[in-house]
Amino acid sequence: MTYNLWGDAHLEQREPAIRDLFSIRPPDLLATQELRPRSRAVVDEALPGHARVHDDFPGWGTQSNLWWRQELFDLVEYGTRDVGILDTDARLFWVRLRPRAGDARPLVFSTAHLTWPGHAQERADRRNLRTGQAEQVVTALDEIAGDEACLFTVDINDIGQPLWVLGNGGFLDSFSALGRTSPVTHPVAPLPFVTDRGTRLSPLGSPSKAIDWIFSRGPIATRASEVVEFFSAGNAPSDHKPVAATFTLPSTTA
């Protein structure tokens, strides 16, 4: 599962829904964007059988982290890579995991949150920042994962060129892999604690779009994919919808 947790926005109202989501349907693997220390603590509480990266680099608590079910995976190594994302401590975050069951192949699990189109630099020069960031992600994962099975999860903040870059880099999203198109992942509506119609840059509301993705590459097969509709006591956990997918890792002898 990949999930943008919407930073600190209305977090107090959303905490019960975040907790309920992960308690009701805990994923084996979870990638997050717009993470904060408080929401990280909520996820930790809701996923007691999972481990995540513990590291002094601030981005693991203020941008993204990666969780895995401990009975299924062992951590081999982890790291970050600067891929040009214009936000403090934003990186490509990744882990290499070894499945415990049978002789399944190792897996690189990674995430990033590409720069928002409303960033001051992009508004000033009118140049798409995410295309180059996607190119750097592909280059980084070429080096990190090589020919290994690789999952890349992302809030891509775009509907065009960055997606094409990933596809031409050998990645296939979990819906295309099944001959489908993704449902909308942002924005979630209704949100009872949000009354504004527009955004801080425009009176227009944010259009419905799919910007949250799970991509795969290498020896790993997509079996199912879903954009999750979830509310708890009338509240959504975020202004994004989580995306969940099921994969099969072949054995090392296959």
Question: In which residue ranges do the predicted regions lie?
Answer:
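Active-site flanking residues adjacent to catalytic metal/cofactor-binding acidic residues
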Residues: 3, 33, 112, 153-155
